[in-house]
């Protein structure tokens, strides 16, 4: 019986230790929120600008493993700016708007006047910080997600520019960490960001 217990514990140890492997990993970031299509009109969406310093344009975060090696996570497509631009478009479309990609526009009221012709609203965004830091501790993984964005909403009928700073830090502990759980963590956070920041 003692021998069987030792074998069982050995299997559990190998499972906990061996499930994680260092290196590059990729996750899908998208928008899953459900909305009633109560809005109408055309929205122009400019590309998000990534202002993070010394980070790859697709970088999302990392996880430190038990042996201090590291998994590094990137968004599929290797372009976080393009991903967030696409997600904002999905958010507006799920609320009933139609969307069109537009060129970057001057982030001033004059810029709104020049760029918003034919649109109900125009949108731009800036990534100041976006990183998930995770550390494996035995069978669990502690995650800290920092998101800092600046959203710009140009309202055409008022020729007005609304600047919307968004900053949040979220923490979560997962008993069994997987790529899908990291995706869920990030996607839920972004859903909260856009639903609270871009209110109609």
Region spans (language model):
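Bacterial N-terminal signal peptides that target proteins for export
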Residues: 1-7
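Short beta-strand->alpha-helix linker/helix-N-cap micro-motif
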Residues: 89, 93-111
